[in-house]
């Protein structure tokens, strides 16, 4: 910290906020996941981690409730160029598959693009397994792992690590969508399926609290009502209570 000036110009040193901490020194590690291969309406979230890193040096560090906020030891490794390249390649093929669904339906699209769908699902499984292992290592080292995506599907590996590390935990989801669809568009780990997968796979998940949901299917509403772990605060109810 002797060379870090919280009142000076942010230095683009490769770490988030230009902070001077290494991973070994950090209490919190941000894991960038440049992935949006299942995004069904518009791409670009895979660029999010790098964009956030690039903009982070523009921030100031005064906080009314946290004295000397800049002493929070946070580290962010470089965005994986390998996974960004894999994502971009699969996105191009996946877009053709998604476009065909919107014209001819899911069954017809899968008959033509089945190999593409399988490749994306397999790559996603590998990504999730890699992320889980990375998060497990950080948890065992006494650090707090955070995922910086990327589409909504990306944190599942982190959630699996938490599930393996704790006897019980909860998820707070602030979102417009419930993400409770089962393999949306055939993607086993779709951005629209992460909370469905969490409820299905995580044995120690005790509560899923959803806040601000405003765009949801009837089947998702039914699942939300039937699973006692799910507590959904719909946007329309919050608005009615506020006004």
Give residue ranges: language-model regions.
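Conserved alpha-helical scaffold segments that buttress catalytic/binding sites
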Residues: 2-243
């Amino acid at each position: 910290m002797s060379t870090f000036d919280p009142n000076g110009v942010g230095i683009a040193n490769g770490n988030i906020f230009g902070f001077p901490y290494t991973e070994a020194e950090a209490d919190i590690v941000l894991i960038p996941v440049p992935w949006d291969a299942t995004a069904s309406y518009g791409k670009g979230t895979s660029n999010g981690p790098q964009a956030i890193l690039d903009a982070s040096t523009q921030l100031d560090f005064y906080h009314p409730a946290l004295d000397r906020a800049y002493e929070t030891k946070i580290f962010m490794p470089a965005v994986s160029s390998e996974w960004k390249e894999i994502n971009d390649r699969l996105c191009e093929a996946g877009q053709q598959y998604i476009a065909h669904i919107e014209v001819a339906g899911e069954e017809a699209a899968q008959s033509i693009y089945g190999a593409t769908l399988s490749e994306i699902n397999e790559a996603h499984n590998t990504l999730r397994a890699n992320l889980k292992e990375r998060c497990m290592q950080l948890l065992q080292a006494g650090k707090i792992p955070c995922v910086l995506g990327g589409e909504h599907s990306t944190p599942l590996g982190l959630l699996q690590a938490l599930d393996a590390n704790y006897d019980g935990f909860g998820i707070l989801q602030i979102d417009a969508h419930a993400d409770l669809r089962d393999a949306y568009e055939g993607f086993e780990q779709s951005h629209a399926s992460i909370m469905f997968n969490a409820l299905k796979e995580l044995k120690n998940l005790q509560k899923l609290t959803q806040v601000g949901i405003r765009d949801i299917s009837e089947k998702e509403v039914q699942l939300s009502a039937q699973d006692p772990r799910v507590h959904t605060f719909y946007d329309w109810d919050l608005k009615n209570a506020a006004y």
